[in-house]
């Protein structure tokens, strides 16, 4: 599923960014761009934690494959931009068209071609790679136990009368358990779970009562926060019910704490694509659950009956995340 979701997320983000359908779900022609992103991210992930490795181009010697991949992706972006610039600006409402209209509030200058290239490349890498990881994680967790799968499938199938009804709106928003499954998957397997370093401003600051001098870099890994017993009961167990509770006697929900929950980071540099990512996952899994019965390929009759799976979807930190699997079987469901 990791490869399938890579293709799907790439197709969605390139369509949103450039109003272009590369259809990598069905055709292999442009899948090299996905491989280039994956290979290039290995180097970037290391440099994020150890930027000194870039001195005298040491990283080029350590990661030759990543360097080749970088130029392949740059070449792809230039090709896409050339086609997009040749198209009429007025006919598209993609991200690229909005970037073309951006102007510096002080100078009034528009973005240069190089700046447009950088911004759109960032949208594709950040949007496609993280979304595909999130969807792969959700598919792993909801197929990990009969309890979870049956409940989320029943919620979707009882909410919509046909697959054509599945779209953004009140009905989809009412699928609270599906949203809880997504939130819990993002807690256990955040697509960007490493430490995102920030430099302390001149003069220093107090962090939780400890003075940190200016120009020091500080960070805490999102993965470690999400797995802290200080915030979550049984932090290594997949339990979507921690995000979903029936109304209690006082009419309020009892939910897990939101403040330490940060799969999209926090603050002014948090992910601007969060609403798009959540909407994308809600629609994708609502449609999959309505159309198909899903099982893991190694499905057995003792399928974690009545329990949630404690097996974590493993990720490797490559700037965003490298993943593999799960392997699932799909069969068209018998509709009433």
UniProtKB/Swiss-Prot annotation:
Q: In which pathway does it act?
A: Secondary metabolite biosynthesis
Q: Does the keyword Thylakoid apply?
A: no
Q: Which domain of life is it from?
A: Eukaryota
Q: Which Pfam families match?
A: p450
Query: What is its induction?
Result: Expression is positively regulated by the leucinostatins biosynthesis cluster-specific transcription regulator lcsF.
Report the EC number(s), separated by commas if there are several: 1.-.-.-
Binding, heme: 271
| Requisite cofactors | heme
Q: Name one GO molecular function term.
A: heme binding
Q: Which UniProt keywords apply?
A: Heme, Iron, Metal-binding, Monooxygenase, Oxidoreductase
- Report the sequence similarity comment from the record: Belongs to the cytochrome P450 family.
Record's PANTHER family?
A: CYTOCHROME P450 (PTHR24305), CYTOCHROME P450 MONOOXYGENASE ATNE-RELATED (PTHR24305:SF237)
The UniProt function text for this chain reads:
Cytochrome P450 monooxygenase; part of the gene cluster that mediates the biosynthesis of the lipopeptide antibiotics leucinostatins that show extensive biological activities, including antimalarial, antiviral, antibacterial, antifungal, and antitumor activities, as well as phytotoxic.
Q: What protein name applies here?
A: Cytochrome P450 monooxygenase lcsN
Q: Which organism is it from?
A: Purpureocillium lilacinum
Gene expressing this chain: lcsN
